[in-house]
């Protein structure tokens, strides 16, 4: 499998507070990795470094030079109720994911709109194209933002606690959709719900300042303690 990125002896801090220390970690095509660990352990910072939003204080992250930097990464952040207050509809949000790939503000082409319509249909949102976000259920809203994350055909999909805003009726469908997406992109998913994600991920990155990689979807409480990676 082709490498997507590799972290080498990477450390990150906020002022004097070291958040990640001496991290060595690599992600390749077809990986589906659950990122777990205690609150404040560095999970979200790990994602921000991959996204280029936080710079390491030492070490480095190296991306495969054969990958086009723009559109390489899709990102589904934690969703809050504030995200639904904007006067935009489903199509607007999904298509906004293409602006990252285009880099500049430009009018969307007929081809862009056709692609957005295909994503909306793929995610089971047909008929809701003109619906405002405030009209959607939690599961529908999560699908809209997932559509925004994948419309650029990323090689890597980052998910930050995706289960927090998913209603129970859509939960299984959501993870089934991730399984399909994993056929064409690697997935790195931050979650505190090991019970749910263990049926879907292939391995774990246990993050608590240090990062310990566990190459199996099965992980015991004893192993979590050995990794200094209790789950809260």
Model region roles, listed by residue range:
Residues 59-73:
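Conserved ABC transporter NBD signature motif
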Residues 157-161:
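Catalytic Walker B motif of ABC-type/P-loop ATPase nucleotide-binding domains
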Residues 5, 19-20:
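Conserved structural motif at the start of ABC-family nucleotide-binding domains
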Residues 109-128:
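Conserved ABC ATPase "signature" region
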Residues 207-232:
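Conserved beta-strand-loop-alpha-helix hinge in the C-terminal portion
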Residues 51:
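Helix-to-loop junction immediately C-terminal to a conserved catalytic motif
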Residues 132-136, 140:
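Conserved ABC ATPase signature
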